[in-house]
């Protein structure tokens, strides 16, 4: 029983959705990331911008004048967030439709020299992994056991959302497949009808030709 509980806990931990990375961008470059998010799910984006210093051949904290323009589009290509933030920040939004959400970032400054680079550290957290449980425990005065139960309940809720999202994707795929199969069927029938009509026309044409030549 204990081994089963450990396996379940490991499985739940594996289902955390988070990614941490960094990337380089130039002054006019735009970087976008696609995150598949179930509906009614919180997404947290943490970022930090560093400016390349040619004297030290490394990256240093960027000046206050350099910020990042962040734009988020949902699966319907609607803008749900678009604004300029400082060189370091934390962005939060909640999805209202399931599907691919596109997070785009680019610099809002043209003050730095051409050829310079920015390094952007990015960490995207989705679902219950985005919840600050230390803050929750402090606000709600939860014991360690109560906090752990809260975490497990949130994980189960996130798993349910993921399952619903997978069913939604399967339904969309099935609808697309059925629509494609229907179009292929009607196109095949149309081709067959055209061939039959052409064959009938050729037969009549040949018959008229033979009758004109008095061969039949």
From Swiss-Prot:
Residues 21-182 are lumenal. The chain crosses the membrane at residues 183-203. GO terms for biological process: dorsal/ventral pattern formation. Residues 1-20 form the signal peptide. Residues 30-126 form the GOLD domain. Residues 134-164 form a coiled coil. A motif (Prevents secretion from ER) lies at residues 213-216. It holds the Pfam family EMP24_GP25L. It is a single-pass type I membrane protein. It comes from the Eukaryota. Eca and bai are essential, though not redundant, for dorsoventral patterning of the embryo. Specifically required during early embryogenesis for the activity of maternal tkv, while the zygotic tkv is not affected. Involved in Golgi organization. This is Transmembrane emp24 domain-containing protein eca. It comes from Drosophila pseudoobscura pseudoobscura.
